[in-house]
């Protein structure tokens, strides 16, 4: 056990290596960003003149980016709950970081596309709008809320309301023409939409 080894021999020449090895265990086996950061900090504090300390400090400086990349890697491996846990840690630990809005949006995206849990997707996208106004993810989250109501839940009244918010808030957004088109044709059969009729004929 590396923790026991470090307690018994904190000044051993291999101690910094053992401490840094714990970082990689929590990174690659336990997927626990909180303990990764704790062990990175212990490496820099307890072994300040070691090569591992320099490496650990660089990782601390880039830690928010690492969390996002790690969460996306976990998602690709279908480890969705661990991915969400990493993203929630990012939001809690770095609430004002520029990547926190992205973390919140990815959580919504996981619920939407991977877990197909649309109620939770709506909640998570809503948190992007509530907590990260002016972020680039805000407009995408507002669009996705309208999209879920229109195309998945078939709640056209709520879809119209959410899409109207999008048009009002983001009149010059690249998605606005598509949103306007969708609002005009909410609930219509594809055969009743002249611009799309050729698709079924």
Segments (PLM) and residue ranges:
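Acidic, polar-rich low-complexity tracts and alpha-helical solenoid repeat scaffolds
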Residues: 1-201
């Amino acid at each position: 056990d590396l923790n026991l080894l470090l307690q018994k021999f904190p000044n051993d020449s291999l101690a910094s290596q053992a401490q840094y090895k714990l970082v990689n265990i929590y990174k690659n086996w336990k997927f626990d960003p909180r303990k990764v950061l704790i062990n990175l900090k212990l490496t820099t504090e307890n072994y300040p003149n070691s090569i591992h300390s320099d490496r650990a400090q660089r990782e601390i400086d880039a830690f928010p980016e690492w969390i996002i990349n790690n969460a996306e890697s976990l998602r690709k491996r279908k480890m969705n709950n661990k991915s969400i846990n990493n993203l929630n840690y990012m939001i809690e630990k770095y609430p004002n970081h520029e990547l926190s809005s992205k973390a919140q949006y990815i959580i919504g995206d996981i619920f939407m596309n991977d877990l197909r849990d649309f109620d939770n997707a709506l909640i998570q996208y809503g948190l992007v709008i509530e907590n990260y106004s002016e972020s680039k993810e805000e407009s995408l989250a507002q669009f996705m809320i309208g999209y879920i109501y229109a195309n998945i839940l078939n709640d056209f009244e709520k879809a119209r309301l959410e899409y109207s918010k999008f048009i009002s808030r983001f009149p010059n957004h690249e998605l606005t023409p598509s949103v306007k088109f969708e609002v005009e044709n909410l609930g219509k059969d594809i055969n009743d939409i002249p611009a799309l009729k050729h698709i079924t004929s």
